[in-house]
A protein has these predicted regions:
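Conserved nucleotide-binding/hydrolysis micro-motifs of P-loop NTPases
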Residues: 43, 63-65, 101-105, 143-146, ...
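Conserved C-terminal guanine-recognition region of P-loop GTPase G domains, centered on the G4
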Residues: 81-170
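Glycine-rich, phosphate-binding/catalytic loops in enzymes
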Residues: 32-33, 43-44, 74-77, 114-116, ...
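Basic Arg/Gly/Lys-rich low-complexity intrinsically disordered segments
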Residues: 1-15, 194-211
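Canonical P-loop GTPase G-domain recognition
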Residues: 134, 144-207
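Conserved G1/Walker A P-loop phosphate-binding module
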Residues: 1-76
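P-loop NTP-binding site
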Residues: 20, 188, 211
Length: 211
């Protein structure tokens, strides 16, 4: 029954994140899909779809937020397309993965707040919760870019902000990763695989064997 229903309507595993989050590189590492990875942030500038299994499609969304080397008009158009895709396809998104650069979280957040803006990373997680009715998988990427103490401080602040000061209720949904060292990637694969299987889908995400 699951296979028949899935084949009738595409369902999506959606990856979101700012242009410099390392989103597309993470997708490639997790899934083994042949995704083009650019040398500069913001390479993904359109909605890209990749079939995973019967009825299941991975969606790599463009980076949300400020883009380097493009006009403000183009940047706004891309950002509008991201939000429109998420809102119009919310009922068909079975899993959302929000990726962000944990190494610069506080620095970027404080800079935005001085200008009267909310953190794009926090805003996206809350937005996904609102339209999907469940907490997304959140990936705090690039933990190798700063000292452990800085990463811990950034992560603690992020958890407090997305949970209204109750970090323990969201901690299990947040995974720390480094593509450079591979740390945390196996655990993230396990989590995505388990969630998709629980919803009746076959996945290409390899489960890390326990020692």
């Amino acid at each position: 029954m699951h296979t028949l229903l899935h084949s009738m309507q595409e369902k999506y595993v959606v990856f979101t994140g700012r242009p410099n989050a390392g989103k597309s590189s993470l997708i490639k590492e997790l899934s083994g899909l042949n995704i083009t990875i650019g040398k500069h942030a913001g390479t993904t500038r359109k909605v890209s779809k990749y079939p995973l299994s019967d009825g299941l499609v991975l969606v790599d969304l463009p980076g949300l937020g400020k883009m380097v080397g493009v006009s403000k008009r183009f940047e706004n158009r891309v950002n509008d397309e991201i939000i429109e895709f998420l809102e119009s396809n919310a009922q068909d998104i079975i899993l959302a993965v929000a990726v962000f650069d944990i190494s610069t979280f506080l620095e970027v957040t404080w800079r935005l707040e001085k200008k009267g803006f909310m953190s794009v990373d926090v805003e996206m997680v809350r937005f996904l919760m609102d339209i999907l009715g469940e907490f997304p998988v959140v990936v705090a990427n690039k933990i190798d870019k700063e000292k452990k103490s800085e990463i811990a401080a950034n992560l603690n602040e992020f958890l407090n902000r997305i949970s209204s000061g109750q970090p323990s209720i969201v901690r299990d949904h947040v995974f720390t990763t480094s593509l450079k060292t591979g740390k945390g990637v196996g655990e993230l694969k396990n989590a995505i695989h388990t969630k998709l299987v629980a919803k009746g889908y076959r996945t290409p995400f390899k489960v890390k064997r326990q020692q």
